[in-house]
């Protein structure tokens, strides 16, 4: 988990017109919410928001908020980020103020390590789930969860319940769900034959 710092400004005015003006000034409109507080409208410099999400942790980076009155020195993560459908630029951000002693739920990417022995034997790697839902303290949010697939043979899978997790991290997905598998040639040929028959 990476820790970042980001300046924020409180804003009293909201609405589409105000949001457009902020974006034209290279600012991103947003809101900060959390347990025991009313949502607070804020604005953030576009480049600062980019920097706060830089690195492998992305939206799960733990951010120290600077400024914003009572929000100053609060810890937060990016809960939701809206982007322009065409340009991909940031339109609005939701920041979740967290309590460092209370667990929260986040989505963490899965990273595969090594080359499966089944692939070397001609099988096809099927990476079915690229993310896992986990619960942990904010300070324990992993940048990613690594799975070593080196010994994964043809017609075998690694399921959620078999993954080694970092200390203090609990996975919420069904433990029987296959995350990565190696499909064999026989299965591929059967699927191809079935598709040909349907056609």
Curated annotation (Swiss-Prot):
GO cellular component, one term: cytosolic large ribosomal subunit
Coiled coil: none
Domain of life where this protein originates: Bacteria
GO biological process: translation
GO molecular function: 5S rRNA binding; structural constituent of ribosome
Keywords: Ribonucleoprotein, Ribosomal protein, RNA-binding, rRNA-binding
Cysteines paired by S-S bonds: none
Pfam annotation, one family: Ribosomal_L25p
Keyword Membrane included in the entry's annotation: no
TM ranges: none
Record keyword Membrane present: no
Oligomeric and partner information: Part of the 50S ribosomal subunit; part of the 5S rRNA/L5/L18/L25 subcomplex. Contacts the 5S rRNA. Binds to the 5S rRNA independently of L5 and L18.
HAMAP family in the record: Ribosomal_bL25_CTC
Annotated function: This is one of the proteins that binds to the 5S RNA in the ribosome where it forms part of the central protuberance.
Family, per entry: Belongs to the bacterial ribosomal protein bL25 family. CTC subfamily.
Protein name: Large ribosomal subunit protein bL25
Organism: Pelobacter propionicus (strain DSM 2379 / NBRC 103807 / OttBd1)
